[in-house]
Each structure stands twice: as structure tokens, then as C-alpha cells.
From Swiss-Prot:
Keywords: ATP-binding, Helicase, Hydrolase, Nucleotide-binding, Nucleus, Ribosome biogenesis, RNA-binding, rRNA processing. One of its GO terms (biological process) is rRNA processing. It is an enzyme of class 3 (hydrolase). Residues 56-226 form the Helicase ATP-binding domain. The gene is FAL1. Its EC number is 3.6.4.13. This is ATP-dependent RNA helicase FAL1.
């Protein structure tokens, strides 16, 4: 697994794919530029993942493409390699535009493009909000082969005529379900109308609801489809648990007990609102726990600094809103805690996908109040999975506020209350194992913690 992709999971993955799509088993079979191949191998890839082996050739042919695959299967590299194959680095003009829903993701994509194109003298700029407009203008006027950005700032630079669009041949929508949501939809259309009529469109995401797929017909022509079935989206190697917490105010003490008990490499804790992130961060620090936090209202410099510390391992626990749920890779994250269950079921898989990246083992723990039972059941039905109650042992793992009475009993009823087609994706469902023992077995004695 030197290239960071779980090949066992890849082999089991089934694609609902257009009939004309063929599989390229190696990068050499894709007839890529020699300097691009050098960059791919230097980046650590040895052979293409399932989505890469199907999508790269089609994108390089100029076909509009819809690619949906699990988190951590190399989607970013899929379109980055394709972009680097089709651009002309002699021409100092923007030829590919990548739009992302968050600034951090846009910056990460820029890093991937630069790394893969290390031997090609490629220029790629991250055009994102919250940064110095003058720097954007200077970089864009100088000429960039690829621009990775957020819709608002990109649209602004196009309107100001600093981002020249006449040579753009490819538009990539990363995390397309979020971009085509109401919050970004008009901005995407605003950008699209400035592009040349023949611009190729590539749509990429881990989740693509039917209404989003239907919407793509407005700006895509006869697209090639590479789609993973929805019930195969739950991540391989990622164990999902719930903890029944009858009252909202008991969540904090439960979290403190988890923090005291587990040993992890790095963890992300998700809350649904910025106010909750700030409140929980303050409470954890008051209790002498070392945590960092991030949400969309923070200045971009502060967000960049927090991200850098977290990537470098200087910060171990990050509390965040869904701004961190989309596509961001920190390979040492092994635990995700949903302090609040996401109100949008598509966001669930994006959140838990921050753990167990690139085929590593990971754990997702969901705090569930009586008001969240419907949401939990909806997630199980939607992804055809079963989320088990977290095993515990009084001597090894003790919650001071063990609220497992009626709610826990209801949640752990017989499987007759669950859909018959649900399958359990787990390493072990034997509840007599203690949770620390499960982690030890699952991670082969790799510490996962604080």
C-alpha cells in the first residue's frame, strides 16, 4: 500500500459505469507525458486506483465526466493528473479551473497539482477568499496554467478580467454535491457563463444525490459516468459506533471521558454550528484539555495557521464545523467524533472519511440523543450499514454519566427494527470485546490517540 490506497477494498468496489469506459491497469497504459509519470511516481503512486484507472483516460480524451468514488481513493489525483496531461505549459494562460467549496480544499488541490507536476514547470495558483486580492491579481496577471479556487473569489477575478478565461479547456467541480447546492449554485453558473462554449466539465465527489446528477445535464454534454453504488460508499476499514447520550448537556462529560481514556494519533470533533465549536473549545480548555478549533468565520490567516499545525502534528485534536469535512487529507487522523450528528446525511460520509485515510484503519464515534435517533436510522438506511453501540468495560472504559437506559435499549433492539438488507461493516461485532481491545486488534497495536 505504498501509494496510500487500500487495494483489497479497491478490488471489491463495483462501479456503475458507462459501457465505453475501459480500465487502464497501469499509468503507462494511459500514455501520459514522461515528466508527468515521473511526478506521479515521485508522489508515491505505484499503480492507479479503481477510479483513476477508469476516469483519467476518459478525461484526457476530452469527455465530460462524472466520477463518484469513496473518500481516500485518489479522486483529487484523478483530475489533477488529467489536467496536467492536457495543458500546454508553454502557453502561460489559465487552461484548467478547479472549483472547491472550501478554501482549505482549494489550497490542498493546488499542492497536489504542484507536486504531481513537479517536473513539468507548471504554475498553479490558489484563488480563495479571505486572502490578499492584490496577490491574486499579481499571480493571475503573471499567468497561471491551473487555478484552484473557491467560487466567490474566482468569479470576482473573472469579472475584474484578471483571470482570463479564453484558453480554459477544462472546468472541474470538486465536491460537486456541495458546489451545486443552493449556497454555491448561482456562483457556479456565474463562472460557467464566462467560459468558452467547448469547455470540458468534470464533476467529482464522494456523494452525488440524484437531484445533483440531474442538475449536471444543464452544463454537461453526454457525460461519461463512473459511479459507485450508494450502498457501497461506507468506508472500508472504518469502524462506526454510537454512544447513546440521553441529554445534550451530558455530551461534554462523555467527551471528557473519551479524551481521558483513548490514545489516538489525531482526532477531529465535528459540531453543527460555529457557536457550538467556540463553546466546546472553551469548555475543553477550561477542563485543561489541549484542543484547536476552526470554522468559516475565522480569518483566513488563522485558518491556515491552524491547518498547518494540525498537518504537522503540533495539534492533536481539532474541533470544527463541516468546513473541515470535505476532502481534506491529514493522514494521521484515526478518530472522528460527531459531537452533533450532521443534519445532512450526505455530510456523514464526508465527515467520517477524515478518519482512516488512504486505507488506514479508523474509528468514527457518534453521540446520539433521543432527538437524533431518526437521523441515525436515516443514515443507516441511506448507506445500508449498521452503526453499533460502542463496547465498554467498567474497568477499562467508564463513562461518569453512563446514560444507557431506555435510549440505549431502544437503539440496540434486535435487528428486526432495522432494514433487512443492512450489513455490518466492522472488524468485530462481538460486544464482549472491550473498546480498547477492539482498537488494539484493529490497528495492530498502533496507538490512535491523544
Amino acid at each position: 500500500m505504498a501509494d496510500g490506497i487500500d487495494r483489497t477494498a479497491e478490488e471489491r468496489m463495483e462501479f456503475t459505469t458507462s459501457k465505453e469506459v475501459t480500465v487502464a491497469p497501469t499509468f503507462e497504459d494511459m500514455h501520459l507525458k514522461e515528466n508527468l509519470l515521473r511526478g506521479i511516481y515521485a508522489y508515491g503512486y505505484e499503480s492507479p486506483s479503481a477510479v483513476q484507472s477508469r476516469a483519467i483516460v476518459q478525461i484526457c480524451k476530452g469527455r465530460d465526466t462524472i466520477a463518484q468514488a469513496q473518500s481516500g481513493t485518489g479522486k483529487t489525483a484523478t483530475f489533477s493528473i488529467s489536467i496536467l496531461q492536457v495543458i500546454d505549459t508553454v502557453l502561460r494562460e489559465t487552461q484548467a479551473l478547479v472549483l472547491s467549496p472550501t478554501r482549505e480544499l482549494a489550497t490542498q488541490i493546488q499542492s497536489v497539482v504542484m507536486a504531481l507536476g513537479d517536473y513539468m514547470n507548471v504554475q498553479c495558483h490558489a484563488c480563495i477568499g479571505g486572502t490578499n486580492v492584490g496577490e491574486d491579481i499579481r499571480k493571475l496577471d503573471h499567468g497561471q496554467h491551473v487555478v484552484s479556487g473557491t467560487p466567490g473569489r474566482v468569479a470576482d477575478m473573472i469579472r475584474r478580467r484578471h483571470l482570463r478565461t479564453r484558453h480554459i479547456k477544462m472546468l472541474v467541480l470538486d465536491e460537486a454535491d456541495e458546489l451545486l447546492n443552493r449556497g454555491f449554485r448561482e456562483q457556479i453558473y456565474d463562472v460557467y457563463r464566462y467560459l468558452p462554449p467547448a469547455t470540458q466539465v468534470v464533476v467529482v465527489s464522494a456523494t452525488l444525490p440524484y437531484d445533483v446528477l440531474d442538475m449536471t445535464t444543464k452544463f454537461m454534454t453526454d457525460p461519461v459516468r463512473i459511479l459507485v453504488k450508494r450502498d457501497e460508499l461506507t468506508l472500508e476499514g472504518l469502524k462506526q459506533y454510537f454512544i447513546a447520550v440521553e441529554k445534550e448537556e451530558w455530551k461534554f462529560d462523555t467527551l471528557c471521558d473519551l479524551y481521558d481514556t483513548l490514545t489516538i494519533t489525531q482526532a477531529v470533533i465535528f459540531c453543527n454550528t460555529r457557536r457550538k465549536v467556540d463553546w466546546l473549545t472553551d469548555k475543553m480548555r477550561e477542563a485543561n484539555f489541549t484542543v484547536s478549533s476552526m470554522h468559516g468565520e475565522m480569518p483566513q490567516k488563522e485558518r491556515d495557521s491552524i491547518m498547518q499545525d494540525f498537518r504537522q502534528g503540533n495539534s492533536r485534536v481539532l474541533i470544527s464545523t463541516d468546513v473541515w469535512a470535505r476532502g481534506i487529507d491529514v493522514q494521521q487522523v484515526s478518530l472522528v467524533i460527531n459531537y452533533d450528528l450532521p443534519s445532512n446525511r450526505e455530510n456523514y460520509i464526508h465527515r467520517i472519511g477524515r478518519s482512516g485515510r488512504f486505507g488506514r484503519k479508523g474509528v468514527a464515534i457518534n453521540f446520539v440523543t433521543s432527538e437524533d435517533v431518526r437521523i441515525l436510522r436515516d443514515i443507516e438506511l441511506y448507506y445500508s450499514t449498521q452503526i453499533d453501540e460502542m463496547p465498554m468495560n467498567g474497568t477499562l472504559f467508564y463513562l461518569r454519566y453512563r446514560p444507557m437506559s431506555r435510549l440505549s435499549l431502544w437503539l440496540t433492539q434486535s435487528n428486526s427494527c432495522r432494514p433487512s438488507h443492512v450489513t455490518t461493516l466492522s472488524w468485530s461485532t462481538n460486544v464482549e470485546h472491550t473498546f480498547p481491545l477492539l482498537l488494539m486488534n484493529a490497528f495492530s497495536k498502533i496507538q490512535i490517540g491523544i
